[in-house]
A protein has these predicted regions:
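Metallocofactor- and cofactor-centric catalytic cores in central/energy metabolism, strongly enriched
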Residues: 1-171, 175-254
Length: 254
């Protein structure tokens, strides 16, 4: 996904008695995937905290403050657990950040033959603990389809693309003003909506009389450069086939 418009905050979990090298390599791998996906990342550096991860309360608060400084940029937060992770640090990071954005919790899978003290992740259980703690803190989150996912897999990239898209939609709709053209046709109850519910989500509805739109359309000339450019865009978007040019032009003006 080549999309540089998405900015995600990254929280890397760690837990002291689990192998640190898994956090070091896991953080690097996730950052590489995010870069490949064209996603801008806001995260702690390895000079900010141990391994650039969060484990202690102090590290969580440092990460939370960093996110708060980038509130206007961050559209979503990815929590990744290369090892078990510290659930309190993950939740505390989100609490301090005061962000109200989509959160995706990801866990690394363990590998057969690497279940000893040196290489065991136990992220499977760590994810359940982190999610439980987030729930206690009242922080909403979403999960990957598979409980654990290899960051190098196509499955993870697909999860990332979907989450980035959701984050962009949420970010775009908050504070948006939607134009409602004309009144609702009496026979179509399916298009009813509540302005109060929309406003509660930060979305304003601005009614526009249909006559105003039609007046503006009639004022446009067929040879207007803006109209011709839109006609070309309509033709490029779908096959107009035998549609009359007049109809295509009217669509372009609208």
């Amino acid at each position: 996904m080549a999309n540089g418009k998405t900015t995600l905050g990254l929280v890397v979990g760690n837990r002291g008695f689990f192998p640190d090298h898994l956090v070091e390599s896991g953080r690097k791998q996730v950052l590489e995937v995010l870069e490949k996906a064209g996603i801008k990342v806001v995260c702690l550096s390895t000079s900010d905290t141990k391994l650039g991860a969060v484990e202690t309360r102090e590290e969580a608060e440092k990460c939370g403050r960093l996110f708060r400084e980038h509130t206007d940029e961050i559209q979503g937060v990815l929590v990744t657990l290369p090892n078990f992770g510290d659930e309190r640090a993950v939740a505390q990071t989100m609490r301090v950040s005061k962000l109200d954005v989509p959160v995706l919790v990801h866990a690394f899978p363990d590998e057969k033959g690497k279940m000893g003290l040196v290489d065991r992740r136990d992220s499977f259980c760590g994810k359940m603990s982190a999610c439980n703690c987030l729930t206690q803190y009242g922080i909403r989150y979403s999960l990957t389809d598979s409980h654990t996912v290899d960051p190098g897999s196509d499955e993870f990239l697909a999860e990332l693309e979907q989450f980035a898209a959701v984050s962009r939609v949420v970010s775009g709709l908050r504070g948006a003003t939607i134009g409602a053209i004309g009144t609702r046709p009496p026979a179509f109850d399916t298009v009813r909506c509540s302005e109060k519910i929309l406003e509660a989500s930060g979305i304003s509805l601005e009614p526009v009389d249909l006559s105003e739109i039609l007046f503006a359309v009639h004022a446009l000339k067929d040879d207007d450069d803006r109209v011709k450019a839109r006609v070309d865009a309509v033709k490029a978007y779908f096959a107009v086939c035998d549609a009359p040019i007049e109809a295509v032009t009217k669509i372009a003006k609208l």
